[in-house]
């Protein structure tokens, strides 16, 4: 998919009810997007499969729902207050601000920006970038720009009352480690999974829903004893890659990239990114980080609470290490949509737009199409039957049957059931497959075998 197709996809997603510009009637807010009716269904299907794949498939993974607002000391302890920042630079000619590292990466993709200090970035830009973003350049000094959104609790605007919108969901898991382990009588190794909103005041958000200031994360923190021989890190990298394939992403559009030492976050011992080939280039889709015992050790120190684990077999106390597979739900959804968006030539004079979503992800698994209104009562009977079976189904009675097929193809509906005269006689319907467009006659209750 190229950039032009990307623009076509965005326009289609808006028209079809997947994604809308946030606050659109007031001129919008940059890089905010609302999920429409079909976007909500698709997002929920991705989320539910993530839970099935990473959580419910094992008996030692537990769910948590921690809050967006945490005690500010959490972020001081985690290092986010001191370390969670971007190198911000201003072009004094056009008065625009940019992330210095991203400007260099964009213009000089072979430069290893991760190894550069802020001073080296600034010197590099002043020497090599004399024009950018349709303007001549006079670069300011680089400043550290903290990515956390700050607000105040209570009625007094007092720095002592400062509180932050969380920039990641992980810390809510770490500070609840003791509660979860005790309540669930969990033995190492075990994991805690969480889904929730996070907020980062990004300097240069963009590329549709790939990078936004408000986003949703799906994270798993897998706790284990570092001294016990294991291959958990490699296993979770492989499991994460398999997860992407099962969502319908192509191997040709995926790559595994290990972070260099200079790239590692302050908490990380090792990190691997799964990257996807988006229309705008390769971008991180999922990160698997070996965080060691940094988080639990740091929170133990700052809170004076011992976040330890007592091994029931050896009576040994230890602070567990953790491996974290983390994925942004919004950018994963974008990758899936880029992969699925297709225009097919059906004949010399006819093309169709189709979202070839994996069956488990389709917003609607089935569309009920009465051939004419006379058949609506029977169609409603079939609709109610499938709803009772917890099947995601839609009802479409307007326009010709051909136009309705195309409409359902364009939103990813996997099967269409056409109700006609014969349906009234023997309960059969015409089943049409989205991808092959093949049709066959079945009893309407047999659709369950296809799902």
From Swiss-Prot:
Chief localisation class: cytoplasm
Molecular function GO labels: ATP binding; glycine-tRNA ligase activity; protein dimerization activity
Record's keyword terms, sorted: Aminoacyl-tRNA synthetase, ATP-binding, Cytoplasm, Ligase, Nucleotide-binding, Protein biosynthesis
Gene Ontology biological-process annotations: glycyl-tRNA aminoacylation
Catalytic reaction list: tRNA(Gly) + glycine + ATP = glycyl-tRNA(Gly) + AMP + diphosphate
Binding site for substrate: 99, 168, 215-219, 324-328
Binding site for ATP: 200-202, 210-215, 284-285, 328-331
InterPro entries (alphabetical): aa-tRNA-synt_IIb, aa-tRNA-synth_II, aa-tRNA-synth_II/BPL/LPL, Anticodon-bd, Anticodon-bd_dom_sf, Gly-tRNA_synthase/POLG2, Gly_tRNA_ligase_bac, GlyRS-like_core
Subunit structure: Homodimer.
Protein's UniProt name: Glycine--tRNA ligase
Native organism: Mycoplasmopsis synoviae (strain 53) (Mycoplasma synoviae)
């Amino acid at each position: 998919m190229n950039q032009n197709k990307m623009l076509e996809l965005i326009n289609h997603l808006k028209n079809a009810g997947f994604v809308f510009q946030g606050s659109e009637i007031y001129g919008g807010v940059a890089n905010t997007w609302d999920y429409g009716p079909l976007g909500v269904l698709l997002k929920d299907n991705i989320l539910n499969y993530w839970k099935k794949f990473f959580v419910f498939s094992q008996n030692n993974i537990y769910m948590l729902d921690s809050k967006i607002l945490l005690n500010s000391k959490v972020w001081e302890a985690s290092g986010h207050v001191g370390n969670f920042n971007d190198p911000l630079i201003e072009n004094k000619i056009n008065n625009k601000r940019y992330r210095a590292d991203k400007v260099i990466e964009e213009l000089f993709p072979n430069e290893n920006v991760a190894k550069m200090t802020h001073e080296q970035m600034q010197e590099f830009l002043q020497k090599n970038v004399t024009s950018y973003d349709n303007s001549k350049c006079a670069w300011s000094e680089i400043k550290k720009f903290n990515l956390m959104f700050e607000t105040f609790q209570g009625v007094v605007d007092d720095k002592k009352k400062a509180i932050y919108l969380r920039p990641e969901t992980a810390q809510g898991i770490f500070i609840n480690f003791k509660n979860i382990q005790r309540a669930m009588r969990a033995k190492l190794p075990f994991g805690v999974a969480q889904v929730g909103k996070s907020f980062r005041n990004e300097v240069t958000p963009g590329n549709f829903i790939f990078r936004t200031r408000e986003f949703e994360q799906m994270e798993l923190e897998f706790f284990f004893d570092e001294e016990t021989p294991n291959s958990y890190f490699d296993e979770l990298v492989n499991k994460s890659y398999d997860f992407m394939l099962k969502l319908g992403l192509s191997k040709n559009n995926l790559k595994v990239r290990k972070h260099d030492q200079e790239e590692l976050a302050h908490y990380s011992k090792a990190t691997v990114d799964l990257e996807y080939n988006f229309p705008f280039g390769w971008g991180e889709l999922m990160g698997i980080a070996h965080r060691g015992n940094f988080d639990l050790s740091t929170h133990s120190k700052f809170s004076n609470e011992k976040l330890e684990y007592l091994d029931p077999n050896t009576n040994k106390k230890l602070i567990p290490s953790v491996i974290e597979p983390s994925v942004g739900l919004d950018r994963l959804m974008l990758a899936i949509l880029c992969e699925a968006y297709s225009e097919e030539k059906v004949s010399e004079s006819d093309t169709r737009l189709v979202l070839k979503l994996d069956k488990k992800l389709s917003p609607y698994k089935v569309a009920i199409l009465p051939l004419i209104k006379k058949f609506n009562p029977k169609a409603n009977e079939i609709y109610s039957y499938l709803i009772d079976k917890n099947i995601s189904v839609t009802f479409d009675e307007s326009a010709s049957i051909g136009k309705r097929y195309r409409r359902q193809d364009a939103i990813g509906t996997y099967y269409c059931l056409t109700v006609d005269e014969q349906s009234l006689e023997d309960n059969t319907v015409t089943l049409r497959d989205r991808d092959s467009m093949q049709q066959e006659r079945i009893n309407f209750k047999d659709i369950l075998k296809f799902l």
